[in-house]
Amino acid sequence: MLHHIQPADLPRALAHLMARDPAETPTALRRRSFLKLAGASGLALGAFPHLALAQDKAPEGLKPSQQPSAFVRIAPNGEVTVTVNRLEFGQGVMTGLAMILAEELDADWTKVRAVHGTGDAAYADPQFGIHLTGGSNSIKNSYTQYRELGARARAMLLSAAAARWKVDAAQLRTRTGQVLGPGGRKASYGELAEAAMRLPVPITVALKDPKDFSLIGKATSRLDARDKSRGRQAFGIDVRLPGQLTAVVARPPVFGARLAAMDDSAARAIKGVKAVLRIPLDRGAEGVAVVADGYWPAKQARDALKLQWDTSKVDKPDSERLLAQYRDLAQQPGPRAMDADMAPLASAPHTIDAEFVFPFLAHAPMEPLNCTVSLTPAGAELWVGSQSPGLDGAAAAGALGLKPEQVKMHVQMAGGGFGRRFVSTSEYVIEACEVAKAARAAGINAPVRTLWSREDDIKGGYYRPLHLHRARIGFDANGNVLAWDHVLVGQSILAGSVFEQYQVKNGIDATATEGLREPYPLPMRLTVHHPKVNVPVLWWRSVGSTHTAYVMETLLDDIARATKQDPVAYRMRLLGDQHPRHRAALQLAVDKSGYGKQPLPAGRAWGVAVHESFSSVVAYVVEASVKDGNPVLHRVTAGVHCNLAVNPRSIEAQVQGAAVMGLSMCLPGSAITFKNGEVQQSNFGDYTVARMTDAPAFAVHIVPSADAPTGMGEPGLPPLAPAFANAIAQLTGKPLRELPFKLG
């Protein structure tokens, strides 16, 4: 998601956003307040100190994100609480980061727990400078940070023990939550924490040799698994405050439309309804919020509203018309992301002409969007599963007319997100603030939870964009590509955002073209068109690779099939010696699957794909068939190269989850469509996500490595659909050029 954004660009982009006059927009932010640094020395014992109170005590040379006090709490009983600087929404980051810190701390893992950090600057991503979760960067960007935090905390505990026993710290060692000294002396971390927290924080610390790891690299159960499996884990949707009310919002059927007339008499008559409020929405639209005692009366009242919408001033997209426009646009000249000589196309012995269509897709997290806002005399408090609590908190301050430091963010566990919980405009958070503000103006002095239904979520916009690809490829009898003329048409997800001026170059959004450049050495001319469409779009799990990987990996199979080459051998030849991680992942998947060594049951075929995204490589070898005219995925064998596997069990889960989401893209009904400007889907009855009955058998294998870990939240998604499609094409002889699959 954020892998194309350079670390130097993100603070500049946010500074640009924050420098605007607050009167210009409700999302205006103030840079000085938002980026205020806070720090503290020592280990926190009991409750965390407020970081800003000890800012002047921070050791020179250490940022707040490098000091253990914000991240490690050791209770007298030895329980270690690790604060994570990311949102946990199913990817296992709470466990992974806690493992990394606990490894260097030599903590007793049975006494380790993890909690979310706040929007404070101490919890900023060490690369990007703000608190965010995205781009599969969590473990990748914080691996060294959390190792050093654990090592600093351990060094302080050793110093505390050395002072207590009046010995040199070099004579001491640690083991599972204890400091061990000469003569059999020992002290638990809980006994030493109070003294350790008063000591200076060491700037330079020695880290373990990876060969000495006892926790990192070990398949470990997640810290939150027990509560989740027993229904005890609370999510943002579960927040309950004294006197809390619930709001639902009636939004226009066409994006950007405004309210023309309203009859709310029937809605107000429903028992439990407290207010019906007209509020501003994202993209200049208007909506109507119903505030009530609970969700059911609020929903009943919303259903009872009689609303008329003015759609005269907004464009009304239509899926069929859009696709025709995209096809016309693909014929036009446009900016080039890559260039090459296309003259060999005219005389190429073999050619392929292909068009691919990828629909709009909803994120559809299991927990719909929600945000609880409490307005207080001191400012405001928000409870929300935010991927960027610093940005969302500052945006909330702008909407409420407060200073950023007057807004307190309580980051909640989230039930999935896939990119939807990080919007550069903080749209759903600002909406909740507008509801709370309007409720206060109506005389309501209570916390208000704004809750989206599944229908609100599916129809609410911010989709993966519709994309059209066209490719004309010339190649010889050996499969050597002589020329590849490629056109991509699709909305830019960064256009109109704070990131546009930094990450859209020459009219080309880099997130749209990722996956078309590497790893294969191809003479490609790539033309890109980004049309303006009245559909809000956003990054979606694995971003551009959701469509580019499919195009590249299915076309490579087409070339291999046309030249009678084994698709694995063909890929290996193209990869050469320049991409050893791709080769290792692909070979591992091939070896573990039995590809080419054992016969498949009648009616089944192999499919292969390999793709790098977010600095990790995933290769799939799949078994598939066609039953009653429908494609069936039976088995998936994965080869994964993500460098050091911090928690192999979590990586296995991420690969499986991403693959199932990739499978969803292939299934009939997995598309958002428009007619006269309105979204035609509303729930899982007409918007398909894979069910348990669709899921294949999985085997996930990881290439051993001691190099620093790379991202794993998203890389398992892109190669699944092309591997599946390649297997079906082996059976039918016909390539699949459109998602979801159509075998008619």
Mark where each language-model region is:
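N-terminal secretory signal peptides
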Residues: 1-29
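C-terminal catalytic domains of large/alpha subunits in multi-subunit enzymes
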Residues: 102-133, 160-187, 261, 269, ...
